[in-house]
């Protein structure tokens, strides 16, 4: 399975094409719209979320509520485009109109300046439009399709925020994936500890008043993943490496860890390695899950625990200093519409890219033309692993 996305932040629409989805997968536009709605939620979101109510149009690859095995095309209209018809026009326009929303004061921490250097733009809006997090709309749409595949295979996925701008959120021990999903869904800030809810919301309000932004750490957990996805035989076959690339490809994400992650550098081997157990009922399990469900670049049957760190959003309402690319004189950076934080929304994006990567890996290992073949192949593999 593979996909491409296209579209600009203020262009007419966003598009994704997905290839390799088996025939027979139940899929409706509403399945995708539910995920798009989640992405637009969360405390601290800006005015763009009031303008856009994202809804997908499926224009290929689905008939009578099921996938056909052909490429799937997804489109989401940008309602805000009506205010940008001249600025984002495909055809050439007058120079006076071109300069109307030209960006020449790049924002520190954004793709503006380096994108202009790379592609030789004199208007940095070209960098901004495609590098905008608006693109993640389609990654969530693609992820919604991937989640339907995972659900058919009894694989469940959830995310929650564990660090909010330096404030660590205590997570109760022993929560299942379903419990994490339920608790995070009930929280406006996607945390599982409801006692911290009002504190975090007040903190976001203060950051907004300060004209600043905050980042944090998001944890995605996946249950029901069969052992043996990924491989140790080549560096680019390791599934944890593929997931790391997928997570860090999300706008503003700067790092990823699995299980205890970077804490492993402070612990002894006897404190980190997960002892192997076996029972007639469950087959092979681990006493702990410090490695986050991975050994040798492969899934080991335990829940996957993946954390991604998101830097603060680079657009500040009290902008940092930059340089005018025409005069090279010091100048305050451009201010575009932004949020004090997008952690809850980013969690949905992270969940989506993890789901897409896992679905792709499953279809690589259990190559199938239709869902019945896929479900039978995965069930057979699970039985084999349990009785190994």
UniProtKB/Swiss-Prot annotation:
Specify which residues bind NADP(+) according to the UniProt entry for this protein.
39, 45
- Source organism: Streptococcus suis (strain 05ZYH33)
EC no.?
A: 4.2.3.5
Q: What is this protein called?
A: Chorismate synthase
Q: Which keywords has UniProt assigned to this entry?
A: Amino-acid biosynthesis, Aromatic amino acid biosynthesis, FAD, Flavoprotein, FMN, Lyase, NADP
The EC class name is lyase
Report quaternary structure and partners. Homotetramer.
- Identify the cofactor(s): FMNH2
**By its UniProt entry, which InterPro entries does this protein fall under?**
Chorismate_synth (IPR000453), Chorismate_synth_AroC_sf (IPR035904), Chorismate_synthase_CS (IPR020541)
Any GO molecular function: FMN binding
